[in-house]
Amino acid sequence: DTKYIAGQMMLVRSFVLGINIVAVEPTGNPLENIEQQLDFVALVPLQLENIINYSRERLDRTRCAIIGGAAVSNSLKEKIQNSKCNIFATYSMPETLSNIALQKLNGNDAQDYFEAFEKINLRLDNRGCLCINANYLGEEVVTNDLVELIDNKKFRWLGRIDNVINSGGIKIIPEKIETV
């Protein structure tokens, strides 16, 4: 959806990489009716789960998938281990304009941490939350994400200091739900 930065960045990636865009209506299984081989697809974890359950062969015909909008569960990570598609979890937020780090989720080179892109540097603030420095950003981005910082390029995401739940890119505040 190009109303969001993630959708806009898919268009930018296609222009930069010279790849075709295959647009589908937002759905729980965007590969369901796609017959051709794809080079690149962006999904949320629920879509990946549905594809694994109902259209796995279509995922295996896809060269690369990025997964964002929410954390990928351990059970889903197990289900994708043998996929022929290279699958990466993304770390991003609107303030960073796009992904700043990837975690390879499957295959022999799977990672248990995110690794920041070149020219992105990371540190922790006094709360233990991730701070992002990038040459294209005007100032440091201070997040509410608690992480285990391995070095200035690698981290493990632990959760949110403010208890906000990110589900498909929608931020849910448990305290607001309790008042309903």
What kind of feature is each model-predicted range?
Residues 1, 44, 93-96, 143, ...:
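Ser/Thr-glycine-rich phosphate-binding loops at phosphate-binding pockets of nucleotides
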Residues 45-46, 70-74, 171:
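Alpha-helix N-cap/helix-start capping motif
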Residues 38-40, 63, 145:
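Conserved acidic residues
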Residues 144-180:
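AMP-binding/adenylate-forming catalytic core of the ANL superfamily
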Residues 25, 45, 69, 91, ...:
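Short loop/edge segments at beta-strand edges and connector loops
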Residues 1-50:
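AMP-binding/adenylate-forming
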Residues 84-127, 134-140:
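Conserved ATP-binding loop and adjacent catalytic segment of the adenylate-forming AMP-binding
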Residues 54-107:
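Gly/Ser/Thr-rich phosphate-binding loop
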